[in-house]
Amino acid sequence: MSEVIERIQSAITGNRICIFMKGNRNFPMCGFSAATVQVFEELGVPYGTVDVLSDPELREEIKLYSNWPTIPQVYIDGKFIGGCDIVRELYETGELQELVKSALSQSA
């Protein structure tokens, strides 16, 4: 297993909610990343972020890992959820809140 894959898996398993994004939660570097962070800020839940702009190899590898071509990418409880549009859609229907609640209720 490559070192990049290990870092991806470590970020995903180390955070109940993990966002691979351009920039970071305090300074998103694209509108889609900013919109995704805003959803989780509105939910008021803990989440981790990984700045893909700081590591070009990781930026490309995460797309292969998830088989998803765009950034941001959201993982909840180790499962790939999707990007900005999917996260916003799930938020609007209430499904995201249920996924988050379930993931956070399992944390020790």
Whereabouts are the PLM-identified features?
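TIR-domain catalytic/interaction hotspot
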Residues: 6, 59-64
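Local sequence-structure signature of Cys/Sec-based thiol-disulfide redox active-site neighborhoods
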Residues: 9-46
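Acidic beta-strand-to-loop metal/phosphate-binding motif
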Residues: 20, 73-77
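Thiol-based oxidoreductase modules, predominantly thioredoxin-like and allied folds used
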Residues: 41-60
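Thiol/disulfide oxidoreductase modules built on the thioredoxin-like
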Residues: 64-70
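Non-catalytic, surface beta->alpha helical segment in thiol-disulfide oxidoreductase systems
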Residues: 76-106
